[in-house]
């Protein structure tokens, strides 16, 4: 593994970790504030919270996996699912944003997921 490969993977891991902290703390407070003030049923509000934090957990898993691969490059195959999910997530944000959900293009999700996929790929290629 090249010196730069380690740093590419660690940049991807850092983006995911910072994203996880922001999403899990700041984003959750803002999002759940809006959801809790809505007329949604309590079960829907609870499921919304679960869905929100499933993505937070995904960000943690991405950060952990990319950092692990940076230190143990023999396990670089573990980065491929992280690259794929981040890439498909970025495409989903863009696809929906180009349709009826234009506000998604103003959110950082597509860009951060795309950049994470790029740095992870650079780190293992």
Located regions from the model:
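Short juxtamembrane and helix-loop transition motifs at transmembrane-helix boundaries
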Residues: 39-47, 66-77, 93-99
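Core segments of alpha-helical transmembrane spans in multipass integral membrane proteins
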Residues: 14, 18-30, 43-71, 83-88
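Membrane-helix boundary connector in multi-pass membrane proteins
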Residues: 72-73, 91-107, 120-125
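Hydrophobic alpha-helical membrane segments
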Residues: 55-56, 79-93, 111-117
């Amino acid at each position: 593994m090249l010196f730069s490969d380690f740093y590419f993977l660690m940049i991807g891991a850092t983006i995911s970790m910072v994203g996880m902290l922001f999403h899990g703390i700041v984003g959750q407070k803002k999002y759940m504030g809006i959801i809790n003030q809505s007329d949604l049923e309590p079960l829907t509000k609870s499921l919304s919270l679960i869905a929100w934090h499933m993505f937070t957990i995904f960000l943690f898993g991405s950060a952990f996996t990319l950092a692990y691969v940076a230190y143990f490059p023999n396990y670089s195959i573990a980065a491929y699912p992280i690259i794929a999910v981040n890439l498909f997530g970025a495409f989903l944000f863009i696809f929906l944003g180009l349709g009826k959900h234009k506000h998604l293009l103003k959110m950082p999700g597509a860009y951060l997921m795309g950049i994470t996929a790029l740095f992870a790929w650079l780190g293992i290629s």
